[in-house]
From Swiss-Prot:
Taxonomic classification: Bacteria, Bacillati, Bacillota, Bacilli, Lactobacillales
Gene Ontology terms for molecular function: aminoacyl-tRNA deacylase activity; ATP binding; catalytic activity, acting on a protein; proline-tRNA ligase activity; transferase activity
NCBIfam families: PRK09194.1, proS_fam_II
Subunit structure: Homodimer.
Keyword Cytoplasm: yes
Localization (cell): Cytoplasm
Protein's organism: Streptococcus agalactiae serotype V (strain ATCC BAA-611 / 2603 V/R)
One CC-aspect GO term: cytosol
The protein's name in its UniProt record: Proline--tRNA ligase
Family annotation (PROSITE patterns): AA_TRNA_LIGASE_II
Domains: entry comment: Consists of three domains: the N-terminal catalytic domain, the editing domain and the C-terminal anticodon-binding domain.
Substrates-to-products reaction catalysed: tRNA(Pro) + L-proline + ATP = L-prolyl-tRNA(Pro) + AMP + diphosphate
EC main group: ligase
CDD domains hit by this protein: ProRS-INS (cd04334), ProRS_anticodon_short (cd00861)
Keywords: Aminoacyl-tRNA synthetase, ATP-binding, Cytoplasm, Ligase, Nucleotide-binding, Protein biosynthesis
Length: 617
């Protein structure tokens, strides 16, 4: 493919509105352009990469018996009313009316549609299992689109749905998808973790998220690609290294989620779902009496602990939430933070939000900072973190502004349901007892769910079993964020290319090193002087030879300065660069392997053999 015929609008500078490196590079390198807030056009390079990723998915899904189809993006609201999600999904749902004033939506996901199609076609367990998927644009009216393709209003997604006679059958397909996802993301060249996740608005029970780990900005060996003029990082002057570090730190570490993972085992979970090892501790032998003490101007845990000269872990933090319009008290030890997702999941609540101070005063008779679990009305449900039950003679709010209780003991002074509702901290013991927890930022690229009968129950999708009894179909759901894969790959494969000029000055600039299976082309073939006939003839011969061997070639035939061509080549990020330059008359070309920065001169007749050796290496 001739570069002069492609739409690749590279920019000389990074876009000023980009905060993460993936967004900046995909715009600067000419992969995407924003059409309006949260809506992007995928230009030829991006489209080729996305199509290659689709090919990987199709190959892996065929291995597990998944069948591709296509459902409409424009959906009748009646289906979503039937499932109950039309009212509960929230403001992200695009709602519209046709000329007859009938309600429609633009699909953000397709559980209802697939459930209806199978409900109307499948009547017996003998017709199951079914494993269907589609690759399609989805729509969500994001309040604040940001970070390029990571948070958009229109996005490309692979969503799959499986239908089963029972949970044992679902378990088999769920495991098939887990392995398929691992194969897909490995082939895509991604550093990822499969982690325990939250089902969120999808409903259902078990779920696993797949997160692309966002690299930190401190490992220079990971970020820098050195030109052949620079032997090692140690040869770069200290002042230049400082400039490089400043440039690296200028970009936000991307990823909407925090991953908690073990340093010594396979345990990994979204921070929303992460837990730690818990071992009950021994309580004090004697219990003190509850005593009300004055604590003027003490509202935070630190202020109360300091005023009473006690350890903060001897205090009970009391928080008030409204869950489905009912008050719920959450108790934690000291400065532990509540994990809203754990609390919401335990309550099986559709809506959970922190109460206002006015609501707190109405229920407790006191404002924030003086709340406590003692003497609460029976109508108020108390959920306590499991660590709270180990406390003895603790301090809590007295439900009177400016006062606290000492000598508070769980069970004797209040009754609660004990469950893990705290947010874990880095350095705590992994729940399997192996290693400690470390945190990393991550980009969600895939999610698999065991939906169970959440949608078949509400939409009447039933089958007759072996005994002729009617049972709801058991479902699974499997999603991959196709367009955000491009962001995740660039986030992990962005590099700073460093070179030294003939005069000894150091230069560095951003570019991409695409993994082989996702690169829009395999080889970037650059002609230094397009006006030189020998160079042109050699370029055409090399292009033909490479294509004959199955290489996809982007030939830079533009009449541009060589520096501009090399700069664009680094930005575009193809794995191999072949340069036809000054030695074209001798049949000599330069080969550069982008991932390592290694370069070698070879005769054009030996190019194919050399590439096979270098790429295998």
């Amino acid at each position: 493919m001739k570069q002069s015929k492609m739409l690749i609008p590279t920019l000389r500078e990074m876009p000023s509105d980009a905060q993460v490196i993936s967004h900046a590079l995909m715009v600067r390198a000419g992969y995407v352009r924003q059409v309006s807030a949260g809506i992007y056009a995928y230009l030829p390079l991006a489209n080729r990469t996305i199509e290659k990723f689709k090919t990987i998915m199709r190959q892996e899904f065929e291995k597990i018996g998944a069948v591709e189809m296509l459902a409409p993006a424009l959906l009748t609201a009646d289906l979503w009313r039937e499932s109950g999600r039309y009212e509960t999904y929230g403001e992200d749902l695009y709602k519209l009316k046709n000329r007859d004033q009938s309600d429609f939506i633009l699909g953000p996901t397709h559980e209802e549609t697939f459930t209806t199609l199978v409900r109307d076609a499948v009547k017996s367990y003998k017709q199951l299992p079914l494993n269907l998927y589609q690759i399609q644009s989805k729509y969500r009216d994001e309040k604040r689109p940001r970070n390029g393709l990571l948070r958009t209003r229109e996005f490309i997604m692979k969503d799959g749905y499986s239908f089963h006679k029972d949970y044992e059958d679902l378990d088999v397909t769920y495991e098939d998808y887990r392995k398929a996802y691992e194969a897909i993301f490995t082939r895509a060249g991604l550093d990822f973790k499969g982690i325990i996740g939250d089902g969120g608005a999808m409903g259902g029970k078990d779920s696993q998220e797949f997160m692309a780990v966002t690299p930190n900005r401190t490992d220079l060996n990971r970020w820098l690609v050195l030109d052949k003029t620079i032997p090692s990082i140690d040869d770069i002057p200290e002042d230049v290294l400082e400039e490089i570090k400043v440039e690296l730190s200028a970009w936000l570490v991307s990823g909407e989620d925090t991953i908690a993972y073990s340093t010594e085992s396979s345990y990994a979970a979204n921070l929303e779902m992460a837990t730690n090892e818990y071992k009950p501790s021994t309580k004090a032998a004697t219990f003190e009496e509850v005593t009300k003490v004055e604590t003027p101007n003490c509202k935070s845990i630190d202020e109360v602990a300091g005023f009473l000269s006690i350890d903060e872990n001897q205090t009970i933090k009391t928080l008030l939430f409204i869950a489905d319009e009912q008050p719920v008290v959450a108790l934690l030890v000291g400065n532990d933070q509540v994990n809203d997702v754990k609390l919401k999941n335990y309550l099986a609540a559709d809506f959970l939000e922190p109460a206002s101070e006015e609501q707190a005063k109405e229920i407790f008779g006191a404002g924030f900072g003086s709340l406590g679990p003692v003497n609460l009305p029976d109508s108020v449900k108390i959920i306590a973190d499991r660590k709270v039950q180990d406390l003895a003679n603790a301090v809590s709010g007295a439900n009177q502004d400016g006062y606290h209780f000492t000598g508070v003991n769980p069970e004797r002074d209040f009754t609660a349901e004990y469950v893990d509702i705290r947010e874990v901290k880095e350095g705590e013991i992994s729940p399997d007892g192996k290693g400690t927890l470390k945190f990393a930022r991550g980009i969600e690229i895939g999610h698999i769910f065991k939906l169970g009968t959440r949608y078949s129950d509400s939409m009447g999708a039933n089958i007759l079993d072996e005994n002729g009894r009617s049972n709801p179909i058991v479902m699974g759901c499997y999603g991959i964020g196709v367009s955000r894969i491009l962001s995740a790959v660039i986030e992990q494969h962005a590099r700073l290319f460093v070179n030294k000029t003939p005069k000894g000055a150091y230069r560095f600039a951003w570019g991409i090193n695409f993994p082989e299976e996702l690169a829009p082309f395999d080889v970037h073939l650059i002609t230094v002087n397009v006006k030189d006939q020998e160079s042109q003839d050699l370029t055409e011969k090399i292009e033909a030879d490479l294509m004959l061997k199955g290489y996809e070639v982007l030939t830079d035939d533009r009449n541009e300065r060589v520096g501009s061509k090399f700069s664009d080549s680094d930005l575009i990020g193809l794995p191999i660069r072949v340069t036809v330059g000054k030695k074209a008359s001798e049949g000599i070309v330069e080969v550069k392997i982008k991932a390592s920065g290694d370069t070698i001169e070879v005769h054009a007749d030996n190019l194919i053999e050399t590439l096979e050796i270098l790429t295998k290496k």
